[in-house]
């Protein structure tokens, strides 16, 4: 790996998921537009790792290594195959996907997940269940994302779990990445892992875990708002201006609403 590629990779993979297009534009300027394909390839890796949604009209599809098929991706539930522009995150060249049907376990998990997401996430949340190749395991993924660059914030919720049918176990991780940059720059990241555990109902186990995660997240943020953020008001000797972090950050929504806005 070249030094340039390492630097670009570090920058991209440390960026808020909803600001990648801005990062791409700036990297193009810094590299004089000479490394467009190399940068785009790294961003594709980033998008797959973060399971970013690609949009076509009102439809949104998840992108990951689980549903990659050649240069395209497939949606096992909606039975479509689609290409993705990883910079604009637009889906295109959509065609019918007929390579394989969803299994009964996959369909049942999707139906239960759909009910859970509709009850606890914004309408814009995207989710799916992918069968992990050469195993009796399923990847359960939920993404809730939104941005308002004009209002200086972006938010991204990603939860991903692996359900093992043979062992009736569930394991996974949930993470939140919220960036607020009006008159300052505050980025809040939090992650929690669900260790492998027995389950009679994977989606119920996910719901219980995420409810506890969100409670802890809100408590943690309230503590920071009352302590660290207040302290920042006394550390601005250059501009001699005070930023009301308590009020600004206190109005920012976290948890499942991290991507919903005020």
Swiss-Prot record:
Which GO biological process categories is it annotated with? actin cytoskeleton organization; barbed-end actin filament capping
Pfam families from the xrefs?
F-actin_cap_A
GO CC annotations, alphabetized? actin cortical patch; F-actin capping protein complex
Give the residue spans that cross the bilayer. Answer: none
Q: Which GO terms describe its molecular function?
A: actin filament binding
User: Which UniProt keywords are present, listed alphabetically?
Assistant: Actin capping, Actin-binding
* Record function comment: F-actin-capping proteins bind in a Ca(2+)-independent manner to the fast growing ends of actin filaments (barbed end) thereby blocking the exchange of subunits at these ends. Unlike other capping proteins (such as gelsolin and severin), these proteins do not sever actin filaments.
Its assembly, as annotated, is: Heterodimer of an alpha and a beta subunit.
Q: Which family does it belong to?
A: Belongs to the F-actin-capping protein alpha subunit family.
State the name under which the record lists this protein.
Answer: F-actin-capping protein subunit alpha
Q: What is the lineage of its organism?
A: Eukaryota, Fungi, Dikarya, Ascomycota, Saccharomycotina
